[in-house]
Amino acid sequence: MPTPLTLADFDYHLPPELIAQSPAAERGGSRLLHLDAASRLHDRRFPDLAGLLRPHDLLVFNDTRVIKARLTGQKATGGKVEVLVERITAPDRALAHVRASKSPGPGMRLRLAEAFEAEVLGREGELFDLRFPAPVLDLLDAHGATPLPPYITHAADATDERRYQTVYAREPGAVAAPTAGLHFDQPMLEQLAAQGVQRAFVTLHVGAGTFQPVRVQNLAEHIMHAEWYTVPEATVAAIARARAHGGRIVAVGTTSVRALESAAAQAQDGPLAAAQGDTRLFITPGYRYRAVDALLTNFHLPQSTLLMLVSALAGVEPIRRAYAHAVAERYRFFSYGDAMFIETPAP
């Protein structure tokens, strides 16, 4: 019987200088590491993806839009406070991470962005329930900052507002970008459509939990963070059409994987159906993929749940080999880094 995998099995050494601090000069200007169905590695450029896709393949994009979720301000006592909105629950309500020297209690008012006050209504686990004096999205658009990942060291600027957002983003609610989609520009999307590659959309609002480390060696003990997703009927129909024509379902990003596989889990052994709700799906090696045939993704943090997800698709050893190759060849890692195209191993 094989030894169960532990957190240590998903560690690797990454020189800090390989963590991309800014995007490529142009969308689509990144490198692409291709792990094919025979587990062979190919060094390519992102535009080469067009030649790896076939007519009737279906690209499934996550159309979530990153909101300007970060706010700074003061408590009534004058102490500094930093707020990161995690989820908008009503037009004037949100659950948020609040960082302060002392946690605020119910009834406390937070003066934010020197512009308005939010009231603390209570707490749900690590998140605070806040009431805002106007629609949350309007206030964030006017006063918030783009919430960059913790490994990006500069403060968000106008370039980040534009480039830490996919060109097809339309459903506001994410606090982190679905980064595999950042490589696509409009000409690339038009080229793929012209060659018969289909597209469909899911929505998964990426939460700050995507950056949280796994803190237990026994993976079965890890509690996965929740994210809200929807797989619409139009996407279910597009998947059925693609399969009927022999096309592959190609997830653009791990968030698209989580949405599609969560819908498949809802359907159990029945046909895929439209679905929405919170998902805590934790994909690790041994998981049987039901909805996804190939994956476009960026490179993921050591010991992260996303590294486990890609290892479940391609195999632990092929991913270890791919990451060692990427480090040796000086690929750029994480959100603003290079991409990887993974085809499911041949049976």
From Swiss-Prot:
Q: Belongs to which family?
A: Belongs to the QueA family.
Record protein name field: S-adenosylmethionine:tRNA ribosyltransferase-isomerase
**Which Pfam families does this one have?**
Queuosine_synth
Name the PANTHER family for this protein: S-ADENOSYLMETHIONINE:TRNA RIBOSYLTRANSFERASE-ISOMERASE
Q: How does it assemble?
A: Monomer.
Which keywords belong to this entry?
Cytoplasm, Queuosine biosynthesis, S-adenosyl-L-methionine, Transferase
A GO cellular-component term linked to this record: cytoplasm
Enzymatic reactions: 7-aminomethyl-7-carbaguanosine(34) in tRNA + S-adenosyl-L-methionine = epoxyqueuosine(34) in tRNA + adenine + L-methionine + 2 H(+)
Q: What is its EC number?
A: 2.4.99.17
Q: Which organism is it from?
A: Bordetella pertussis (strain Tohama I / ATCC BAA-589 / NCTC 13251)
- Reading the lineage from the top rank, the first entry is Bacteria
What GO molecular functions are on record for this protein? Answer: S-adenosylmethionine:tRNA ribosyltransferase-isomerase activity
